[in-house]
């Protein structure tokens, strides 16, 4: 065997393995591992690939429903939408690389999630993202926003998939660890889904796509450790993406799938060739022999260690039907991509890697994954925070000035500056563009549409992880409902700090319990996801951020609702109960200067009952516009509806039973705003009363201003100018 470094405790630690984990390796293989084997174990046993801190808790998630074709465990989740069609989708993080090298980190995050989708045999039709940045005044924030947004747009636009929605937030807790969560959605034939499990002995294992370089080595390990002041030095571990190569890879993969060449397929993502080969073999209960001399490389003198751990982008591994090998090769050559037989399946259940005639690794394949450490880490529940009583909160300004301030804050202002850099209409199927509750994308040339959203409220999750987890799912369910969609399933991206700290693990466990309970109550299963831990720098963790990506179905996309008021003279109805909950509200934080209190409680039965009623109104054509209530509460939602349409509203005063600023800006859950024609208002209100659904008329659309009885009014154009100005001004250098 070639000269390799001697295995020392320092080398083991540098690979992110704890002493007890290394002892486990020694016991498992009965000898000291080679350097290449140490790298393989480091890749397969890190947090990013093994889920060793989270797996025990993830098992409790509801993952089944009659429409679920494939739940967690594959490259992406798959749901049946009827007519022989399936939706394939997943969300993943690229947090650590995006902080170090924002443009490349974001591009490869998009590229990786697109590969997860088309690996399953689906053509990508939409992307979304959830972005969390540090405080605007932090010296790195502008640079990170600029790089990440350019990277997402650069990759998606070049690849040719629309970016149709997302979330962006700013908070000082993300100063040292931004979050870049990318979601991709694709369409496939329900009976032509491709999986990762290899089958058959002595089947050719084929390397496809771009050449292997030294970029991304230990990328997965970097994503499994917290940052410190030396993190900038990790720039070489950030992968480099090429969207044009990925587009060629997509077309070549779909073509050989259509030609019935494929037994199994796995994209080379985290841990590259190592993870893809091990997963294919282990899932098929087979061994894998690899000959690295056959791997196409773009750099000279690459070692076995480097080739096995490279995370170069735009690469796939396939097990092909032997009789189809020549046909498959011709297809890939036509698209100008590398095609190389790099190994074979074996009955040995061992993972054997050869290079230059030497055996560089010989390991039990199933144990690489199945025997990874599994931790039930100590966790403590977050302390309960006191309920903030609205009558004890002094209003620092009048209602309309408070609204003007809120809509120009970093979290509530328009994100047009971001989404206008994304091509959100390419492919020609985008029905509802960014800026509303959920994006709506047409399903091919038929009448169906998909409702797509990404949601989470991290400040709620910090204050009460259980309620915050429930609320993230409930808001995704509401956003899909508000456009007329029937919520079908979610993908989650669970972003947390260091799980070795009991309080952080407590946040994770609490959020997961809330997510599980909400998914069960709303019949909204989890079909795919990703866990990103160690999101902290120098011991300062991010806010717990379990991003929820939701997918819903519209049988007729023309019967969707938008947030824009449709006409003047229509009745504005508030559906759901309003108590004026100010705890953890944006108003309390950004107007009153208090980030405190318990978040609003989530009533899942009310969410289901009220959401079903609103969806029925949209389908019946009764509702002319609809909007769910979330950040900023009632008046911010009304302002958004007015700004989207250019039509004002005349609003009744707050009821005497609720403090005015709590009524207008409280963030009670399970609420919607709906407009109906004046001729329908009485009938709808009577029907709601009969059904026991809280529903109140709060005003009438019309005019050019938002006017509250007994308060000042403000022109909609004035609001829109403030709403649209903050982000472009900030990115242009304004304080």
UniProtKB/Swiss-Prot annotation:
Pathway terms, separated by semicolons: Purine metabolism; IMP biosynthesis via de novo pathway; 5-amino-1-(5-phospho-D-ribosyl)imidazole from N(2)-formyl-N(1)-(5-phospho-D-ribosyl)glycinamide: step 1/2
EC code: 6.3.5.3
Binding site for Mg(2+) 2: 116, 267
InterPro entries in the cross-refs: PRibForGlyAmidine_synth_PurL (IPR010074), PurL_linker (IPR041609), PurM-like_C_dom (IPR010918), PurM-like_C_sf (IPR036676), PurM-like_N (IPR016188), PurM-like_N_sf (IPR036921)
Repeat among keywords: no
SUPFAM superfamilies referenced in this protein's UniProt entry, alphabetically: PurM C-terminal domain-like, PurM N-terminal domain-like
Pfam families (UniProt xref): AIRS, AIRS_C, FGAR-AT_linker
Gene Ontology cellular component list: cytoplasm
Residues noted as binding ATP in the record, renumbered to the chain: 51, 90, 492, 529
Enzyme class, broadest EC rank: ligase
Residue sites binding substrate per the record: 93-96, 115, 239, 311-313, 532
GO biological-process terms attached to the record: 'de novo' IMP biosynthetic process
Gene3D superfamilies tied to this protein: PurM-like C-terminal domain (3.90.650.10), PurM-like, N-terminal domain (3.30.1330.10)
Keyword terms: ATP-binding, Cytoplasm, Ligase, Magnesium, Metal-binding, Nucleotide-binding, Purine biosynthesis
GO molecular function (one): ATP binding
Active site per database record: 48, 94 (proton acceptor)
Keyword Ligase: yes
Localization per record: Cytoplasm
Catalytic activity: N(2)-formyl-N(1)-(5-phospho-beta-D-ribosyl)glycinamide + L-glutamine + ATP + H2O = 2-formamido-N(1)-(5-O-phospho-beta-D-ribosyl)acetamidine + L-glutamate + ADP + phosphate + H(+)
Primary localisation category: cytoplasm
Residue numbers binding Mg(2+) 1: 92, 530
Record's function text: Part of the phosphoribosylformylglycinamidine synthase complex involved in the purines biosynthetic pathway. Catalyzes the ATP-dependent conversion of formylglycinamide ribonucleotide (FGAR) and glutamine to yield formylglycinamidine ribonucleotide (FGAM) and glutamate. The FGAM synthase complex is composed of three subunits. PurQ produces an ammonia molecule by converting glutamine to glutamate. PurL transfers the ammonia molecule to FGAR to form FGAM in an ATP-dependent manner.
Similarity comment: family membership: Belongs to the FGAMS family.
PANTHER family: PHOSPHORIBOSYLFORMYLGLYCINAMIDINE SYNTHASE SUBUNIT PURL
Protein name: Phosphoribosylformylglycinamidine synthase subunit PurL
Organism this protein belongs to: Bradyrhizobium sp. (strain BTAi1 / ATCC BAA-1182)
Gene coding for it: purL
């Amino acid at each position: 065997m070639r000269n390799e470094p001697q295995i020392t405790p320092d080398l083991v630690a540098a690979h992110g393995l704890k002493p007890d984990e290394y002892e486990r390796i020694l016991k498992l293989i009965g000898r000291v591992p080679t350097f290449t084997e140490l790298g393989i174990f480091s890749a397969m046993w890190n947090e990013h690939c093994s889920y060793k801190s989270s797996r025990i808790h993830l098992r409790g998630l509801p993952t089944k429903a009659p429409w679920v074709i494939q739940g967690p465990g594959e490259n992406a989740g798959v749901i049946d939408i009827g007519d022989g069609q399936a939706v394939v989708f997943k969300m993943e993080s690229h947090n650590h690389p995006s902080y170090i090298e924002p443009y490349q980190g974001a591009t490869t995050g998009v590229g990786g999630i697109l590969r997860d989708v088309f690996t399953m045999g689906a053509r990508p039709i939409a992307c979304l993202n959830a972005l969390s940045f540090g405080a605007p005044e932090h010296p790195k924030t502008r640079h990170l926003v600029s790089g990440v947004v350019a990277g997402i747009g650069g990759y998606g636009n070049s690849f040719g998939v629309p970016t149709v929605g997302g979330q962006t937030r700013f908070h000082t807790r993300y100063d040292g660890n931004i979050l870049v969560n990318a979601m991709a959605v694709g369409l496939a034939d329900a009976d032509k889904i491709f999986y990762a499990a290899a089958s058959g002995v002595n089947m050719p294992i084929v390397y496809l796509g771009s050449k292997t370089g030294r970029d991304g080595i230990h990328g997965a390990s970097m994503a499994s450790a917290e940052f410190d002041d030396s993190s900038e030095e990790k720039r070489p571990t950030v992968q480099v993406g090429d969207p044009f190569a990925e587009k060629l890879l997509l077309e070549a993969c779909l073509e050989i799938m259509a030609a019935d060449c494929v037994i199994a397929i796995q994209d080379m993502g985290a841990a590259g060739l190592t993870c893809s080969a091990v997963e294919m073999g282990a899932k098929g209960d087979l061994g894998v022999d690899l000959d690295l001399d056959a791997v196409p490389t773009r750099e000279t003198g690459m070692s076995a260690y480097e080739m096995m751990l490279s995370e170069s982008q735009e690469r796939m591994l396939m097990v092909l039907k032997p009789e189809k090998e020549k046909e498959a090769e011709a297809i890939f050559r036509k698209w100008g991509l590398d095609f190389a037989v790099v190994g074979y399946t074996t009955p040995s259940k061992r993972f054997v890697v050869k290079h230059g005639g030497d055996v560089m690794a010989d390991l039990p394949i199933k144990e690489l994954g199945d025997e990874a450490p599994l931790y039930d880490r100590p966790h403590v529940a977050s302390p309960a925070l006191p309920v903030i009583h609205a009558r004890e909160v002094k209003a620092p300004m009048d209602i309309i000035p408070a609204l003007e301030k809120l809509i120009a804050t970093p979290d509530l202002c328009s994100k047009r500056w971001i989404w206008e850099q994304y091509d959100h209409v390419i492919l020609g199927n985008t029905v509802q563009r960014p800026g509303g509750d959920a994006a709506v994308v047409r399903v091919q040339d038929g009448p169906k549409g998909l409702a797509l959203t990404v949601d989470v409220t991290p400040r709620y999750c910090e204050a009460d992880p259980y309620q915050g987890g429930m609320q993230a799912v409930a808001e995704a369910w509401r956003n899909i409902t508000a456009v007329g969609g029937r919520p079908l399933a979610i993908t989650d991206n669970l972003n947390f700090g260091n799980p070795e700290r009991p309080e952080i693990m407590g946040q994770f466990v609490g959020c997961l319990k809330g997510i599980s309970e909400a998914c069960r109550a709303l019949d909204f299963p989890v079909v795919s996801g990703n866990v990103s831990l160690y999101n902290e720098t120098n011991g300062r963790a991010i806010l717990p951020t379990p991003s929820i990506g939701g997918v819903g179905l519209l049988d007729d996309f023309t019967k969707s609702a938008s947030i824009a008021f449709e006409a003047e003279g229509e009745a504005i109805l508030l559906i759901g109960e309003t108590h004026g909950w100010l705890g953890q509200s944006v108003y309390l934080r950004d107007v009153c200067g208090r980030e405190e209190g318990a978040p609003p409680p989530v009533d899942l039965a009310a969410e289901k009952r009220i959401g079903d009623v609103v969806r029925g109104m949209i389908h019946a054509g009764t509702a002319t516009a609809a909007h769910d209530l979330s950040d900023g509460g009632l008046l911010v939602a009304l302002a958004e509806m007015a700004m989207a349409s250019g039509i004002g509203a005349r609003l009744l005063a707050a009821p005497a039973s609720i403090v005015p600023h709590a009524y207008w800006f409280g963030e009670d859950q399970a609420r919607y705003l709906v407009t109906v024609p004046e001729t329908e208002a009485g009938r709808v209100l009577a029907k709601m009363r009969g059904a026991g659904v809280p529903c109140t008329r709060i005003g009438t659309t019309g005019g050019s201003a938002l006017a509250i009885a007994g308060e000042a009014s403000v022109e909609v154009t004035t609001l829109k100018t403030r709403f649209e100005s903050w982000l472009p001004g900030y990115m242009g250098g304004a304080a």
